[in-house]
A protein has these predicted regions:
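Loop-to-transmembrane helix boundary motifs in multi-pass membrane proteins
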Residues: 139-153, 342, 375-423
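Flexible loop linkers connecting adjacent transmembrane helices
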Residues: 4-10, 44-48, 70-96, 121-136, ...
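Extracellular loop-to-transmembrane helix junctions
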Residues: 46-71, 94-97, 303
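Membrane-interface "cap" regions at the ends of multi-pass membrane proteins
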Residues: 1-41, 217, 249, 253-256, ...
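Juxtamembrane transmembrane-helix boundary signature
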Residues: 31, 58-89, 100-114
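Hydrophobic alpha-helical segments and their helix-loop junctions in multi-pass secondary transporters
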Residues: 179-207, 215-234, 447-461, 484
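Hydrophobic transmembrane alpha-helices that form the core helical bundles
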Residues: 97-139, 151, 358-375, 483
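C-terminal membrane-solvent junction of multi-pass transporters and transport-like membrane proteins
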Residues: 167, 173-176, 386-390, 396-410, ...
Length: 484
């Protein structure tokens, strides 16, 4: 046993100072940025512009009652070293995995069309309205909409970056772009904040006529879609830190049972942390604390931004329908009317940061989930797992059913399908609202499954990872509210 303990004694303990933790942030900030470019930059201004402060209550409802649905995914991955989809594969006939696969393929097309529409709308406004360059006039001459051209260009760039840099590119871009957006938006809000009396609308439920689509979009995509918790679980696993780093060694040394998606039960996912060497326990606990702080910080920042965008739109744009291809120019009035024309550049930088990073992250996230589903459904894919560059062999690249190739194929499918939809429906706000509302109907199932597997896989004696009584009860309450 001492030799086993010695094999874990060299694990580097991560810093837990604020500066040290921030260097390790990633999945939580990525999760936050998957919603900002649409729910914050488009849906929130549409709510404020059309209904003033009436829908402010939707924001705390979404953030408070969806919190543990996301948190359970982080908790499970940190407690077991496996992803939520590995847990889903232990259900009868793997029905949750099939459910996720089908809904994710739909989201790859319709959902990504909404994300690309928002990003394309920024470029359309900059080049066609603000600068008047008309770069896509050639496309209109042959019957192709300008938004589809910009969407294809942005999508192709995103796919190229993700395939070249893998997870590191996603993580680094997210940190930089999130900082640009947060600073510029808060700065503009401080120039002329909303009246204090409007804050009472946080606690007053009101459903104005014609607001149902925006409400569904808010609840579906604030802070982001619940299905993104599965992406975050895969991202967390991809970092290969904490339990995700040592799980394989634990299986080799007999601390935990090996997990096989085609023969194991959910009991084989469980890790009794109390039986691990003390250094390994501390290593896993620290990474869990960092992961929770990463997620919670992203959740709070996302809440602040969503609130500010709605309040700014209510103050500066109401009454306005907030629609059309030039929607970004209309939203830009928040910045130019409040501070001056010079703020246009700041807004464009923030808007592009939000919308592009959202589309960028989804080009990695949804294909990652589809590939993980196939890894848990098909033996040929499970025999060639992994998409990280250091995991790839010639077989990974040559065998079409490998997880890596399914990941790449899904990425290209998402790009083509999203651009086709965008070309057929060149209405950015409408596409954003519909794709966001779709996430609302998926959320309860994913939230339930995340909670169920945390409660039934993580040992109750594990005080560090097992959900507290409050977290459990509040999670059930949240499910009742979102399904009631």
């Amino acid at each position: 046993m001492s030799n086993k303990s010695d094999s874990f004694s060299t694990l580097p303990l991560p810093e837990t100072s604020p500066r040290g933790m921030f260097r390790h942030f990633g999945p939580g900030l990525v999760l936050m940025m998957t919603g900002i470019g649409t729910s914050h930059l488009v849906t929130a201004p549409a709510a404020g512009g059309r209904f003033e402060f009436a829908l402010l209550w939707c924001i705390p409802v979404a953030y408070v009652f969806k919190y543990y649905g996301f948190e359970m995914a982080f908790r499970f991955t940190n407690a077991t070293g496996r992803s939520m989809l590995d847990a889903y594969s232990t259900a009868p006939r793997k029905w949750p995995v099939w459910y996720v696969l089908i809904t994710t393929l739909i989201q790859c097309a319709l959902g990504q069309a909404g994300r690309l529409a928002a990003a394309a709308a920024v470029l359309f406004y900059v080049f066609s309205e603000y600068l008047g360059l008309g770069l896509t006039n050639w496309a209109q001459g042959i019957g192709i909409d300008s938004l589809a051209v910009y969407g294809f260009g942005l999508g192709a760039i995103s796919v190229a970056i993700v395939l070249y840099g893998r997870y590191a590119a996603v993580e680094m871009a997210t940190k930089v772009l999130a900082g640009i957006l947060f600073v510029s938006t808060v700065g503009v809000y401080l120039v002329e904040p909303a009246p204090f009396s409007a804050m009472g609308r946080f606690f007053t439920v009101e459903v104005p006529g014609g607001s149902w689509l925006i409400i569904a979009a808010f609840l579906g995509l604030l802070p982001t879609g619940m299905d993104v918790s599965l992406q975050a679980s895969e991202w967390g696993k991809a970092k290969r830190v904490g339990m995700g780093r040592i799980r394989e060694k634990l299986e080799e040394q007999g601390y935990v049972r090996p997990f096989d998606a085609f023969s194991s039960t959910k009991a084989d996912l469980s890790v009794d942390v109390t039986k691990l060497p003390e250094h390994a326990q501390e290593y896993c606990r620290r990474w869990f604390r960092i992961g929770l702080m990463d997620f919670t910080l992203g959740h709070i920042v996302s809440f602040i931004l969503a609130t500010i965008f709605l309040l700014l739109a209510a103050v500066w744009l109401y009454p306005s329908p907030i629609e059309g291809r030039a929607v970004i120019g209309e939203i830009a009035r928040i910045f130019t009317d409040s501070v001056g024309p010079g703020m246009m550049v700041v807004f464009i930088a923030g808007a592009f940061a939000a919308t592009f990073s959202t589309a960028f992250n989804y080009f990695d996230g949804w294909p990652r989930v589809v590939a993980a589903c196939c890894r848990n459904l098909f033996r040929s894919t499970a025999d060639l797992p992994g998409i990280a560059a250091d995991q790839l062999t010639p077989a990974h690249r040559s065998v079409m059913s490998s997880e890596y190739n399914i990941y790449r194929i899904t990425m290209f499918y998402s790009l083509v399908a999203a651009v086709v939809i965008l070309a057929g429906i060149p209405r950015p706000v409408y596409l954003v609202l519909v794709s966001s509302a779709l996430a609302f109907f998926i959320a309860p199932v994913i939230s339930f499954l995340n909670l169920y597997y945390c409660l039934t896989v993580i040992p109750k004696t594990d005080k560090a990872f097992y959900p507290s009584r409050f977290a459990t009860l509040f999670s059930w309450l949240s499910l009742v509210i979102f399904t009631g």
